[in-house]
Amino acid sequence: MENPGASQADHSAKFCQWIRICEWILLALLCAYFGARTLPRAWRTLNTDFPNYYLTARLTHEHYDTSRIYEWMWVQRQKDHYDIDQRIVGMVPITPFSTLVVWPLTSMSALSAKHYWLALNLVLLVVTLALLRSMTHLPWRRVALVAALSFPLQVNFLLGQYYVLLLFILTFSCWLYVRQQQFLAGILVGLASGLKIFPILYLVYFVRKKDLKAILGTVVGCLGIAAISLLVFGWQLNHTYLTQVLPAALRGEALNPYNLKAASLSSLLHRLFLYEPQLNPHPALNAPWLFAVLHPLLQMALIAPALLLVVPKEHCPRRDRLEWAAILLVTLALSTSPASYLFTLLILPVCLIWDALEQQRDRISIAVLMSFYFAVGIIGGSDHGGAGWSALLKVPRLYVLILLCVFTYLLLIRQQPRERLKLSLSWTVALIIATTLSIATNLRHQQGLYADYQWRIFTPHDVYMAAQPVVEDDTILFIAFMLDGYHSAVDHFDTVQFSSPSHNDYLAVASTGSERWVEQVGNTSTVVPVNMDKAGIREAESPVVSFDGRWLAFLREDHGRARIWLHALDQPNNSDRPLTPTVLNVLEMAFLPEGTLIFSAVSESQPRLFSADQSGNIRYLGIDDARYPSVSPDGHWLAYSQLDGGNWNLWLHNQDTGATHRFTHVACNNIEPAWAEDSQTLIYASDCGRALWFTALSRRRIFP
């Protein structure tokens, strides 16, 4: 007679054997796809992201002044000069320190550097999988299968991103932590926070855990990274990151905040409740206060369980791994700029959670976990048809991530001893206070932020940035950042014409009224006349023409530092001559009617306003933290932007009396003023309600 128990065990063994066979087959197919499809494509082309890191590291390696690396047009100019085969580059919101990971590769071409980078990533991936295998009870095939099923990992290799490196660091840190090497684990968390800011949430985890060694290690790691960043890049760039880039990134405004393809909580709430004339003309409800309240409230609703479910002062490897997974999952769910490759990091928490479920032999939960994991990798968001409340249907990845967090929290609750299932009053109060402060900060940030819309000039939908306006009678000339590069543009009564598509970028424009000049950028910058048979000026940037049309001033750069040079338009055979000393790094300039130049230049560590006459006599004007000078045609007024609290606002200086007063008072950037011919109206670039420095043009009458 057949033994029912033996028969059942036999069936179970056969089922497990078939599962193993299927796993090996799937792993082999996925690895074959990676080797035959993904890796060759990554090897042949630069794609979008690797050039950002490579260019910054190379400029630093070659001793350039990199204090302006976050300025889109400045870094685009450097990219063109180095002939890097990538249409658009930009550093926002990348940390300065993260670019140093490719420092050793900057002696070679960009594509060759990417080859070495890909090889290093393959090695790091194998080491990471070995650490995961060591940390869990999962067999090699399952650890490898988790990685092979990661579509974000494929994208990471295609674009040359650094998330395999970040995955390795966080995995190694977790491996050390569960082995009671808390100080070293904390140092690695500090290192990870230098690459991407969100791992700093582990510091809060360590505080909740009351783990002094891990706290100390994280602080030491962060201080070490800060010291290296200051030593390599200097104070100015790091200050720009901390006071301008990072706050915008935390609000979800480092890049287009209304883009539902990001599928982030921030982009969804921006789309639902914040009106913007060009980027979001049809929100579900124009209620900025709702965004200010709901964003921190919903963020805390996700973060709080991950922290409150932590068991303080207790180190159990099984429990620590789950807590580690929960913290990483919630940081990914709350990311304000979650590109697909970010979710390469899911490999770590998914392996840790799978291991916990495998020990419980909970196959249904494993199936749910892997379904969530696969869905996060292949779905994102859609920006098509997301007007009004329909935006709620356009971010499926966000909902799957939230479900994955809830799934992990339930697992933590299930594994937590009953006597531990009680809220920490002090932590609950602290989280409520943090949420309240965040809401108050948001409401304060919004004061007057959207008033600028009433003065906005029409901007075509395909223009991401309109900048550097120049007034010519009833026409506005400006530079337009579009999908295929930077164009010169002409706006005549809301009819906009763009320069023809070209391999070169157009990064500046100037006008005498009868003549127009543009900066055309390829291997070098050349200021060329438009529709005229005059010769261009090589190695020249950012042209400005005097009121009488006799002089053209331009910048000539050497290793990222620029001087003013003068070119005589009425005597073109005369040699161009420098006007400012090398000790000043000139940023922008404007002519006074009599021919004197007012310019902004970095002296010591901050930009200041100076004047220079035709003989080169320099005079400091006593105005600090100031850029973008512009003189009215009647010579009575100087407009400029001054930095205060991380924002550039417009100021007016009376040239006759010396009096100054602030013209705008908002927590955004109003820059690059240009005067209309009546000397009563300003056209300027504003990023209020938009992504950081992705400006639109506004026209505003100054005097009644």
What are these regions (language model features)?
Residues 160-163, 335-345, 376-393:
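Membrane helix-loop boundary segments at the extracytoplasmic
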Residues 163-166, 186-189, 236-243, 344-348, ...:
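A cytosolic-side transmembrane-helix exit/cap motif
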Residues 352-446:
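Aromatic-enriched
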